[in-house]
Amino acid sequence: MDSIDLFYDKGKLELCTFINEPTNKFMKLSSFVYGIISFHDGKIRVPGRLTDQLITDDDDVDFSSLEGREVVPRFRRRYSVDKSDLIPTISLAFTLADEYYPHQEYSVLAPNKEYDIPGVVGYGVYTSRFRIKESGLERAVPFIDEDSATASVEAGKLALIHSGVDSRLVGKVYVGSESNPYAVKPIASKVAQVLKLGEEDGDIQGVDAVDTEFACKAATSMFKDAASLVSYPRSGIKYAMVIGADNAQAAPRGCIGGELDTFVGYGGAAFIFGKHDVIAEVEGWYSCTSDTPDFWRRDGEPFPMHGGRFTGDPAYFKHVRKATQKLMEHFNLKASDLNYFVAHQPNPQFPVRIAKELGFRDEQYLPSIQINKFGNTYSGCSPVGLAAVLDIAKPEERILVTSYGSGAGSDAYLLRTTSQLVDKRKRQKINVKFQAENPFIEYVDYTTYRRLKLGM
């Protein structure tokens, strides 16, 4: 019997019921809606849970407002398990297609123009519809069945849709995260399986998948590796995917390390690198590293600690400054020669300060500042900023993006956009602005925020 993949399809919620007394495995979900979803004009019917719904036992659920509406498959945790157990996931949770996450068709395009140097051929950003808003700062909050693995899959899916790349041609996938639900078990293998990356043989994907770690630059460190790999003629790899995703962690306020709880967010970004139909060429890069103890999380500890004054000048500013200046010197560039500058955003102040110090004008760096909308998404932070710039950039513009990872190091990249950037833009409904200003965003209080961050 052939397997059926509905992950990119759109379904219809035919019948549903309200589960207000869930069994133990589903207890953390509280009350939820369960139903029958049909696909392909009713030829296929599957049971599924409606997710991204905060429902209390007292809520009066109007089934007539749900039944008959179109839904989109989502990749989520399935139910709660003990800490030592495997985490069950499923791609048959669903959200309403006319709300935060609309359906987008995944149509594969044959490779067309080949470029001399590699670059980004597509990208995607995923953040949750839930937010907490305090003192003018909004932060994305995962729903209770989300984590860094589910965000990685969703971001990778959006990148494939945007690029038009055949998933079977992706020969390498990197996932950078510091909030993997497992200490030993990669996110990348799950991404590869769900998105069917590489040639599929039975239940095995012909793709190299690896997780990476270097605090908030775990993903950007791999940009150069991905670009190099697709350029090596003997690798046989046409495309490589790099994902940065985190459910950024911080101790509760009032506890040691709780100061970080003001800025942590949730989400991820995925970039596909190749030499065909490039939207932004990678012109060059520079990386720097030092053993600086500005931020850490010991093995077995749930929340990170930070080194106070070491997080500023000796850490973030020193590395971002050096990587940026060295790259600009190598290409004999002044700040005025660039169209956009993207820096890592641990808080709203640091990226603005370093941008001004380096001579960039407001219009060069402000489009990348997304921490005020999503919070610090750790490994996804500077990639989300880069995506925000790519969403609005014009052809033949130069972008300098400099990431930062505690412990400590920075990667600076120089990108040049192409005409294909505009051509592919219409393929992506769910861009950064769409998610930042979405009318279906749901705001939660601090107690709910802490509960959702802990997950199932």
Language model features: what each stretch is:
Residues 1-8, 456:
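Cys/His-rich short segments
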Residues 155-171, 321-337, 358, 393:
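Phosphate/pyrophosphate-binding loops at sites that engage ATP/ADP/AMP, CoA/4′-phosphopantetheine
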Residues 149, 153, 179-180, 198-206, ...:
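Claisen-condensing/thiolase-fold acyl-transfer catalytic domains that form or cleave C-C bonds
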